[in-house]
Structure formats: C-alpha cells, structure tokens
A protein has these predicted regions:
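Ribosome-associated translation termination/rescue signal centered on the conserved GGQ peptidyl-tRNA hydrolysis loop
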Residues: 2-135, 159-161, 171-179
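DNA major-groove recognition helix of helix-turn-helix
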Residues: 156, 167
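Helix-turn-helix DNA-binding helix
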Residues: 151-153
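The alpha-helix within a helix-turn-helix
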Residues: 141-142
Length: 179
C-alpha cells in the first residue's frame, strides 16, 4: 500500500496531480497490465506483472516491470507517474509562502528528502512551479522557497530530467545553462 504523502493538504498548488493522495490520483488513471521482459528466468512472462499507468487528464504515463510481483510494479509505476507529472505538468504557486510540506522538510536552509520518498514528487512539483513562476531565476526562486540557490539546484539534480528541463527552459528564455 502506498502511503499518502504529507503534501496532500499543504502543497501551494493543491490541484497538481502529483500532490494529491495516490489513491485519489488513480481515480483519474487508466491501469494496464502488460508482459515485459525482466528478472525471473524462462517462466517470468507467463503472467502479466508489468504495469502501465496513464493519467487521463494530462495523457502522462509511467510504467514498471522490474519486479515479479504486480503489486510492487504498480507502486513503482504510480511513484514514477507522480514524478513524471511533477516534471511535465505545471500549476501556479501560492505567492505568499511555500507549502507546509516544503517548510517541514527544510532545516536550516537545507531541503532534506530522499529521491525515493513519497514526498519527493510533491516537493519536485513545488520547486519546478516556483522556478517557472519566477521565469527560471534561481535566486528569486530559492529566496521564495527559503533555501540557498545551491540547495535548490542540488535538489533538482536528484531527478536529472528535471534539471535538464530547467536548463532547456532557461536556454529558451535566453539565460545561460546551470551546472
């Protein structure tokens, strides 16, 4: 069972699908069970343990087939879907303050979260939404999020696709890429 993230009630963009309870998110999703190659030897593909989840309102998908148990693959696919939604779907930010989740995870200007924790997609959403809101200005975004620029970049680098997206958007805006 996937534990709902602490962000359910506290994200600055509460309508973002990566920030709602995973079970509620699944109500807007189509789940498909598929056969994929993976661990388990010659009898592995006799059952459909792979899972593909598609978020219907945004058409964003994620899949998992590494494990031999369909339930574990479902949990992994759901987490990946939330990360994909965090990267590819934007909402507006609360102009006043970062979310309570962000504030709880911040300790002396350092954001403490593992990239595999259930809160990670919601925090990633908030960081990317803030950066987008401040037109890809890392300094302004980090001031809003109450952390240093280097901490914000370090957090984004935990998901390389998010960091690549940031540099792509900065380039489109005529700004230099970040390292």
């Amino acid at each position: 069972m996937v534990r709902p993230p602490d962000s359910v009630k506290s994200h600055s963009g509460p309508n973002h699908p990566a920030c709602i309870d995973p079970e509620l998110l699944l109500k807007d999703c189509q789940i498909q069970h598929v056969r994929r190659s993976g661990p388990g030897g010659q009898h592995r593909n006799k059952v459909e343990t792979g899972v593909v989840i598609k978020h219907l309102p945004t058409n964003i998908t994620a899949e998992a087939s590494e494990k031999r148990q369909q339930g574990r693959n479902r949990s992994m696919a759901l987490f990946r879907l939330r990360v994909n939604l965090a990267i590819d779907h934007r909402t507006t930010v609360d102009p006043e303050n970062p979310s309570l989740l962000w504030q709880r995870r911040l300790s002396n200007g350092t954001l403490k979260v593992n990239s595999e924790h259930d809160d990670f997609p919601a925090l990633l959403t908030e960081a990317i939404d803030a950066i987008t809101h401040f037109q890809f200005d890392i300094k302004q975004s980090s001031q809003y999020l109450k952390c240093s620029s280097s901490q914000l970049l370090k957090f984004l680098k935990k998901e390389p696709r998010a960091f690549t997206l940031l540099n792509q958007k900065r380039s489109e805006a005529g700004l230099h890429p970040l390292r």
